[in-house]
Amino acid sequence: GLDGNKGDYDKFYHNVNGQMIRHREIHNLYGMNMTRSAFEALQEICPEKRTLFFSRSSYIGAHRYGGIWQGDNRSWWSHILQSMQQLPALNMAGFLFVGSDTGGFGSDTTEDLMLRWLQYALFTPLFRNHSADGTREQELYRFDNVQAAAEMIKIRYALLPYLYSEFL
């Protein structure tokens, strides 16, 4: 059976044009093709509208169809640093619409970590606060320093015309 480990990728195959291919050889292509298919379908259905897609599983070239979200992270200082380090690498790979879960997804964020993450994330194209069930509710109004968060959100709103023109 499948155990959820890397060895499982050797145990199942996909039929690609009549050829059986191991999943591990096309794993990231799956995410890219899902994004591409959705993008192309919406272009056909409503070509006059701009669309926005982002995925956490992707492949080189997928930047033509959407952005990339850096995946489930933790509410840890090391993960905000990791996000900052990944961003330029993703940019060099062609992914310009990039971002992480502001404040962290898993674990309980602190007010200080959330404010620092906001300061960083307000300059990233993908900007969202998203957390796992069972973690601290991390909507900005739940923290004491709502005014500091509000000031950062004002900066983000001021950047929206630029971000829209560059990324959408």
Label each PLM-derived region with a short phrase:
Residues 1-168:
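Catalytic-domain carbohydrate-binding cleft regions of carbohydrate-active enzymes
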